[in-house]
A protein has these predicted regions:
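Secretory N-termini
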Residues: 14-18
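Intrinsically disordered, low-complexity segments enriched in small/polar residues
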Residues: 19-120, 125-377
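N-terminal export leaders
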Residues: 1-13
Length: 377
């Protein structure tokens, strides 16, 4: 669990042979997707140190052709298993799959099969429970329909167990932003686990004059994860009375205010949110359709709330101008990966911000998910 991303890269963590990998220079033209001007921010919804700006759009894509991980696992159309003796992967030409032999289960790689007739959407930070350890998806991607078993990059969020079955279930959980950032951007197992046990990447920042201590300290979260059990698991954060009750309160208040703010929309639908903690705009998740946003909303809201209770409480509130500036298209170095005919993933980094976009290439070119992160490490 303590191997670095670069060590794992050498041993095949990113082992999908169909992936292409390129670097683009700063200022390269934007790829097709939803125009930046097609979004509008509503008035912010706030509770304590958490503020959300609903993102609405008057147009949206038809995303009914895509399957979510929760749907796929619950219906038996998707299987996730520990890595076994042999895995089949497609080559770049999408020809007959080639066998690859493995010695056995791996902490940072599982095997996923999409049996469905629909392409499968995966988001970084989605948690799958079971197997020998609970894991989270390492990176946004799309898995083609009727596929063969593929290696799936993951990070461990459970320590102290390496036993039990080989199959996984969907935990209906997306880990909170500090953990998602370390998975999707830093891509280091040690950083992921540090965020699991420490709560927030910013919890230990030097205190600002207006900052109050977090509602739940890093020590309390660490104790919650480790206490009274043989294993240390991320899911205990959600299940514990100490952390869970604080999170439940934030979720209930934000949900009530969010519904009130977004009710009565005419000709527009909510497709995402911009998230701020105190006066700092920190995160945004925006989708190609309101249906996709709705599919992930409850899990995302809970993840934002976990981050909120783990961060210092600040009196300042982010402004709408701050949120709009956060959504501007970045102009920095661009890293791109693609699987021909299936998806394109790209990350642009500029001045402490990272923007990640996942484009579907079939059945129609569209940006399914757009993530913007203010990096904390």
């Amino acid at each position: 669990m303590d191997r670095s991303f670069f060590t794992l890269l050498g041993s095949g963590l990113l082992g999908i042979s169909a992936l292409g990998f390129v670097w683009s220079s700063p200022g390269s033209p934007a790829q097709p997707g939803r125009p930046d001007g097609d979004w509008r921010l509503l008035e912010p919804v706030s509770y304590e140190n958490l503020t959300m700006f609903p993102v609405v759009s008057s147009s949206g894509y038809d995303t009914s052709a895509f399957l979510t991980l929760e749907e796929g696992l619950s219906r038996g159309e998707v299987t996730v298993r520990e890595q076994g003796a042999e895995t089949m992967i497609r080559n770049r030409g999408n020809e007959r799959p080639n066998p690859q032999s493995y010695s056995g289960p791996s902490v940072n790689q599982l095997v996923l099969t999409n049996h469905s007739k629909r392409p499968l959407l995966l988001l970084a930070g989605e948690l799958v429970s079971g197997g020998k350890q609970d894991r989270i998806i390492a990176k946004d991607r799309i898995v083609a329909p009727f596929g063969d078993p593929l290696p799936l990059d993951v990070f461990c969020v459970e320590h102290g167990r390496w036993s039990a079955g080989s199959s996984f279930n969907e935990a209906k959980t997306i880990v909170h932003p500090s953990v998602r950032e370390n998975a999707a951007i830093n891509q280091k197992q040690a950083d992921v686990w540090a965020a699991v046990t420490g709560g927030s990447n910013v919890a230990n920042r030097a205190a600002m004059p207006s900052a109050a201590p977090p509602k739940v300290s890093a020590a309390e979260i660490s104790e919650t994860v480790t206490v009274e059990a043989q294993t240390q698991s991320y899911t205990k954060i959600y299940e514990s009375r100490r952390v869970g009750s604080s999170v439940d309160t934030v979720v209930a208040e934000i949900q009530r205010r969010f519904r009130r703010e977004t009710s009565g929309l005419k000709g527009e639908r909510v497709v995402g949110v911009v998230v701020a903690y105190g006066g700092e705009v920190a995160w945004s998740d925006i989708f190609a359709s309101s249906e996709l946003f709705d599919a992930y909303w409850s899990k995302l809201l809970r993840s934002y709330a976990v981050e909120a209770v783990a961060r210092p409480s600040l009196r300042e509130k982010a402004s709408a101008d701050d949120a709009r500036e956060f959504l501007r298209r970045l102009n920095g170095r661009e890293q791109t990966e693609s699987e021909p005919g299936v998806y394109r993933w790209r990350e642009i980094s500029e001045d402490g911000l990272s923007q990640i976009e996942l484009d579907a290439l079939q059945p129609k070119l569209m940006t399914l998910h757009r993530l913007v992160v203010r990096r904390t490490s």
